[in-house]
């Protein structure tokens, strides 16, 4: 498959690690680089992890601690053997003169490595994200070169990552600037109530869209129609009594788990007080 047909999907944890590495950089470092880890399947490069590689850039050369990069990769392989080197990342919104030199190293580590740039300067009020592949140029028997060509990049996340991002969004504006922003964990029933309320609002939005299409107030979108059809087909067919019975059973199980967890918490607190109780 041609490198130009690749699509890059980046998980949020990668961006957090890039920003953390940029904040911890040396004072004389203007740019931070690192290795991208993930998998490649059917033309999709899914980036799930990364780490920073210490380096120094001079006018005519680049010095990178390659032994450190190999050690970090071996450690990551012990934790998750499914993650392989898929490319490299750098802070900034441009491809520099040293990028081709760094890319040559990663071209020896994997096929068609991707180059991801993250604009940590937040130009335009947001973090710019771009991905590139390096295409060889030249004529037979003549000079050759390379050119970084942009390819599509998008953000993706697993369900736990999505939940974590939503929790992080709740910390915005919950406390003054001089105090740490914290959000206490929600109880299980409160989470169910919040999810049900959000689901109800989304259903109302879908119903409004369908009514507007039927009334010819909105131009129908075939892609949205196919997604709604797939959504309807994914709903299991059951009677109202069956749904009520299944829902009540799940609620009973949830209440039982909450009760047992509270009992365990109380027992641990009691055991802690008995442990530190002074003996006669």
Curated annotation (Swiss-Prot):
Keywords: Cytoplasm, Initiation factor, Protein biosynthesis. The keyword Protein biosynthesis applies. CDD domains: MPN_eIF3f. One of its GO terms (biological process) is positive regulation of peptidoglycan recognition protein signaling pathway. Residues 8-138 form the MPN domain. GO terms for cellular component: eukaryotic 43S preinitiation complex; eukaryotic 48S preinitiation complex; eukaryotic translation initiation factor 3 complex, eIF3m. PROSITE patterns: MPN (PS50249). GO terms for molecular function: metal-dependent deubiquitinase activity; translation initiation factor activity; translation initiation factor binding. InterPro entries: eIF3f, EIF3F/CSN6-like_C, JAMM/MPN+_dom, MPN. It is found in: Cytoplasm. Its main location: cytoplasm. Transmembrane segments: none annotated. The keyword Cytoplasm applies. Component of the eukaryotic translation initiation factor 3 (eIF-3) complex. The eIF-3 complex interacts with pix. Component of the eukaryotic translation initiation factor 3 (eIF-3) complex, which is involved in protein synthesis of a specialized repertoire of mRNAs and, together with other initiation factors, stimulates binding of mRNA and methionyl-tRNAi to the 40S ribosome. The eIF-3 complex specifically targets and initiates translation of a subset of mRNAs involved in cell proliferation. Belongs to the eIF-3 subunit F family. This is Eukaryotic translation initiation factor 3 subunit F-1.
């Amino acid at each position: 498959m041609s490198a130009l047909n690749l699509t890059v999907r980046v998980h949020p944890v990668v961006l957090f690690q890039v920003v953390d590495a940029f904040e911890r950089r040396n004072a004389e470092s203007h740019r931070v680089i690192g290795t991208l880890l993930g998998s490649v399947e059917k033309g999709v490069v899914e980036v799930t992890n990364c780490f920073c590689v210490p380096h120094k850039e001079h006018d005519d050369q680049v010095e990178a601690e390659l032994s450190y990069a190999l050690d970090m990769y071996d450690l990551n392989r012990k934790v998750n053997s499914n993650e392989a080197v898929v490319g490299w990342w750098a802070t900034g919104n441009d491809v520099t003169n040293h990028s081709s030199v760094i890319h040559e190293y990663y071209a020896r580590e994997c096929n068609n490595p991707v180059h991801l740039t993250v604009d940590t300067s937040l130009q335009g009020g947001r973090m710019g994200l771009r991905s590139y592949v390096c295409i060889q140029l030249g004529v037979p028997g003549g000079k050759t070169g390379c050119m970084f060509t942009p390819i599509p990049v998008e953000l993706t996340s697993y369900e736990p990552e999505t939940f974590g991002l939503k929790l992080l969004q709740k910390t915005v504006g919950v406390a003054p600037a001089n105090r740490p922003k914290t959000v206490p964990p929600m109880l299980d029933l409160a989470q169910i109530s919040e999810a049900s309320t959000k689901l109800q609002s989304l259903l109302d939005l879908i119903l409004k869209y369908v009514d507007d299409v039927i009334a010819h107030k909105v131009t129908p979108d075939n892609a949205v129609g196919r997604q709604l059809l797939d959504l309807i087909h994914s709903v299991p067919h059951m009677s109202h009594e069956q749904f009520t019975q299944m829902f009540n059973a799940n609620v009973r199980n949830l209440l039982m788990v909450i009760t047992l967890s509270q009992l365990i918490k109380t027992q641990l607190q009691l055991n802690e007080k008995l442990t530190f109780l002074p003996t006669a």
